[in-house]
Amino acid sequence: MMQPLYLVGPRGCGKTTIGMALAQATGFRFADTDRWLQSHVQMSVADIVEKEGWGGFRARETAALEAVSAPSTVVATGGGIILTEYNRRYMHRVGVVIYLCAPVSTLVNRLEAEPEADLRPTLTGKPLSEEVREVLEQRDALYRETAHYIIDATKAPAQVVSEIIAALPPSTQRLQGDVYT
């Protein structure tokens, strides 16, 4: 059994897409803190924030993080999970943290292309490109401080997964044939 792999980064960096592909490539389970939370409270993130505020959402997010953390699991986290110091320390201590790093332009393009974009509550109330820039400026140092590895997430998902696997200690990789899975 291996430590969980936590994917952190801003909205649109590919945590869920890369996470599912990485789980398949490593034979790990996959979990998404936002999806777990939404399925357990039967509300969208926007509804939770509207009813409980960001503080209530962040408390629930910590509970979700702890609930999905298990050996041999790839965990896609919410973009703001690193705002809570406990979460940063927990992920860094319990698992391997991978920051999926991408520039504002890439993040905005991906977010604009997402069909569920309207389900995500605005963080600042500003236009998307301005919001993404501000949020990334506020959080980038926290992502970097928390991460064991920083990976360029602008590439194709398969290439990002290959780079993550190459960066991980050999004991995390399972080689089957000529493909890391």
UniProtKB/Swiss-Prot annotation:
Species: Salmonella typhimurium (strain LT2 / SGSC1412 / ATCC 700720)
Cofactor binding remark: Binds 1 Mg(2+) ion per subunit.
EC number: 2.7.1.71
Cell compartments where the protein resides: Cytoplasm
Pfam families xref list: SKI (PF01202)
Protein's recorded name: Shikimate kinase 2
Protein's gene: aroL
Residues holding Mg(2+): 16, 32
Keyword Membrane: no
NCBIfam families, sorted: PRK03731.1
Free-text domain note: The LID domain closes over the active site upon ATP binding.
Region span, LID domain: 112-126
